[in-house]
Amino acid sequence: MRRFLFSDPDFQTAFKAFLDERRGSPADVDAAVAGVLEAVRTQGIEALLDYSRRFDKVDLTAETIRVTAEEIEAGAAETPADVREAIAFAAARIRAYHSRQRPADQAWTDEAGVELGWRWTPLEAVGVYVPGGRAAYPSTVLMNAVPAQVAGVDRIAMVTPPGKLQPAVLAAAKEAGVTEIWRVGGAQAVAALAYGAGPIQPVDKIVGPGNAYVTAAKRRLYGVVGIDALAGPSEIVVVADNKNNPDWIAADLLSQAEHDPAAQSILITDDEAFAAAVEQAIAERLKTLATGEDAAASWRDHGAVIIAPLDESPALVDAIAPEHVEFALDNPERLSDRVRHAGAIFLGRVTPEAIGDYVAGSNHVLPTSRAARFQSGLSIYDFIKRTSIVKCDPASFAVLGPHTVALAKAEGLPAHALSASVRLPSGD
């Protein structure tokens, strides 16, 4: 864990060096991924099944690769009642939040008489990647599938590594209306969604988190399909004063540290004694936390405490551009309203980031690795597209046509000019 004093003369230099550090050391998997993608593209289902045997040690067929409706129902029934209730509660709130994002079509006639506008249409098919193992989270299903459903996507295809499927993940899929689930993971699953493979039909966009192989596959396939983002390790910044319970703030910092040894948790406070109390609370919690090994590595290698006047916190947050930021303060808006670069902002002393991960309704798929400078979190805008509409009548074309001809000639594109000039009263 690093400690920074804003008052130190070399603070800005040291802080910038800290931000520029690369978190995690992902293997160079691009070459291996390229081979997997090409094999699935050219060999289809045969390559997909072969990779499942080699990498996942399961023997699937084109008939057994799909999760049946009966398996989905059984998984949902196996999920404890309180978890099913929480899934339904979360899904309803996510649905309500994202329903408010629906944009309206626009149409108008301008002063030249040209009819202009745009219309929004949903994507036809979307693939959702849901990791397996410890990272098989029902919230991943909800946060990716529910907005797609709200947007009006016709087909949502989910892929998840083979093996014992987490009942809660199947319960979440049922709640989100996902009936097409394929037991395949890794780069080969991403390739199958992009190119199609046997019974798996191609999609228009792929969303959802994954390991280095999945991320590399999404990067390579961008252009063949759309993707949501290239997700990095989780991040949180907590801006807190000494009126907070140190144990609460420690828990908030650990909530992201437990995801991954490469995750990053940063405390900004104006009180050194409070910072020390939070550090002590973290040390105590790590002794009993089930995910303590990952959390301890994250806090040790990538954590930071910044002692600075709270009025400086918006500028510091903008420099970090974190995935999540909490302002655990009275009247937090006085500072948060000045923040420009953050994936999600949580306000007040009783609004921990974990609420946003599950049940607030806002999306937990957020930009990482300082991408909040130019990117937003997942929303229905990721599942719709805007098409421009233009209509001229003879009178309005007579206004626009000559200018079109002039610009086309200036650009050396005679066929463009001709396309307009032949429609003008003077002809070509």
From Swiss-Prot:
<dbReference type="InterPro" id="IPR001692">
    <property type="entry name" value="Histidinol_DH_CS"/>
</dbReference>
<feature type="binding site">
    <location>
        <position position="234"/>
    </location>
    <ligand>
        <name>substrate</name>
    </ligand>
</feature>
<feature type="binding site">
    <location>
        <position position="188"/>
    </location>
    <ligand>
        <name>NAD(+)</name>
    </ligand>
</feature>
<feature type="binding site">
    <location>
        <position position="416"/>
    </location>
    <ligand>
        <name>Zn(2+)</name>
    </ligand>
</feature>
<keyword id="KW-0368">Histidine biosynthesis</keyword>
<feature type="binding site">
    <location>
        <position position="324"/>
    </location>
    <ligand>
        <name>substrate</name>
    </ligand>
</feature>
<feature type="binding site">
    <location>
        <position position="129"/>
    </location>
    <ligand>
        <name>NAD(+)</name>
    </ligand>
</feature>
<feature type="binding site">
    <location>
        <position position="259"/>
    </location>
    <ligand>
        <name>substrate</name>
    </ligand>
</feature>
<keyword id="KW-0028">Amino-acid biosynthesis</keyword>
<dbReference type="InterPro" id="IPR022695">
    <property type="entry name" value="Histidinol_DH_monofunct"/>
</dbReference>
<dbReference type="GO" id="GO:0005829">
    <property type="term" value="C:cytosol"/>
</dbReference>
<protein>
    <recommendedName>
        <fullName>Histidinol dehydrogenase</fullName>
        <ecNumber>1.1.1.23</ecNumber>
    </recommendedName>
</protein>
<dbReference type="GO" id="GO:0008270">
    <property type="term" value="F:zinc ion binding"/>
</dbReference>
<feature type="binding site">
    <location>
        <position position="211"/>
    </location>
    <ligand>
        <name>NAD(+)</name>
    </ligand>
</feature>
<dbReference type="Pfam" id="PF00815">
    <property type="entry name" value="Histidinol_dh"/>
</dbReference>
<dbReference type="InterPro" id="IPR012131">
    <property type="entry name" value="Hstdl_DH"/>
</dbReference>
<keyword id="KW-0479">Metal-binding</keyword>
<dbReference type="GO" id="GO:0051287">
    <property type="term" value="F:NAD binding"/>
</dbReference>
<dbReference type="GO" id="GO:0004399">
    <property type="term" value="F:histidinol dehydrogenase activity"/>
</dbReference>
<keyword id="KW-0520">NAD</keyword>
<feature type="binding site">
    <location>
        <position position="357"/>
    </location>
    <ligand>
        <name>substrate</name>
    </ligand>
</feature>
<keyword id="KW-0862">Zinc</keyword>
<feature type="active site" description="Proton acceptor">
    <location>
        <position position="324"/>
    </location>
</feature>
<feature type="binding site">
    <location>
        <position position="416"/>
    </location>
    <ligand>
        <name>substrate</name>
    </ligand>
</feature>
<feature type="binding site">
    <location>
        <position position="259"/>
    </location>
    <ligand>
        <name>Zn(2+)</name>
    </ligand>
</feature>
<feature type="binding site">
    <location>
        <position position="256"/>
    </location>
    <ligand>
        <name>Zn(2+)</name>
    </ligand>
</feature>
<comment type="similarity">
    <text>Belongs to the histidinol dehydrogenase family.</text>
</comment>
<comment type="function">
    <text>Catalyzes the sequential NAD-dependent oxidations of L-histidinol to L-histidinaldehyde and then to L-histidine.</text>
</comment>
<feature type="active site" description="Proton acceptor">
    <location>
        <position position="323"/>
    </location>
</feature>
<dbReference type="GO" id="GO:0000105">
    <property type="term" value="P:L-histidine biosynthetic process"/>
</dbReference>
<feature type="binding site">
    <location>
        <position position="256"/>
    </location>
    <ligand>
        <name>substrate</name>
    </ligand>
</feature>
<comment type="pathway">
    <text>Amino-acid biosynthesis; L-histidine biosynthesis; L-histidine from 5-phospho-alpha-D-ribose 1-diphosphate: step 9/9.</text>
</comment>
<feature type="binding site">
    <location>
        <position position="411"/>
    </location>
    <ligand>
        <name>substrate</name>
    </ligand>
</feature>
<keyword id="KW-0560">Oxidoreductase</keyword>
<dbReference type="InterPro" id="IPR016161">
    <property type="entry name" value="Ald_DH/histidinol_DH"/>
</dbReference>
<feature type="binding site">
    <location>
        <position position="357"/>
    </location>
    <ligand>
        <name>Zn(2+)</name>
    </ligand>
</feature>
